[in-house]
Amino acid sequence: MKKLFALALALCLLCGAALAEETPELNWSNIPEEVQANGALQQIAAPDLPVIVYWVPANMTAVDPSTVQADPAPAAVFMTEDGQYTISVFALNVTSLQEYLTALEGAGNKLNNVTINGIDCVSVEADAYEGVIVPMNDTLVLSFVCTPKDGDEDWDQVKGVIFSSIQVAQ
């Protein structure tokens, strides 16, 4: 009886561990059409790689990336009229994906695996921003960064829609 109980306990622990490591999924198809219609899909492309599209709300306009002082420079920037909320997209060449993620985590950022529209990604929660890293290959990542990290309740929902929209162009 003790062996049976021990086996049952071991199975419960294994199942619990497997469930705890389940990767969250975000899907554009789960976003209501009326929300999707309140913005537009933008795209970013890199040579020899698939085109990635992402949603930008109608209240944000494109900003010339060369006017943004950031190192590295972003590939695309969108901002509200008052400049309070921004979406920046960076195309980053990295030594390796694992080294890049290790460095981010070592800098105190919280990383979590997430699947977005079938793409294995990594969410990043930093002091000043929330973002998503989309690995294009082992040495190129797209980093979607939303600032500020903490805004009003609407901004939190908008960030969720932006991140849920990231997908390979059809």
Where are these regions (language model features)?
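N-terminal targeting sequences that direct proteins away from the cytosol to non-cytosolic compartments
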Residues: 2, 6-73, 146-170
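Conserved polar/disulfide-associated segments of primarily extracytoplasmic proteins
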Residues: 65-152
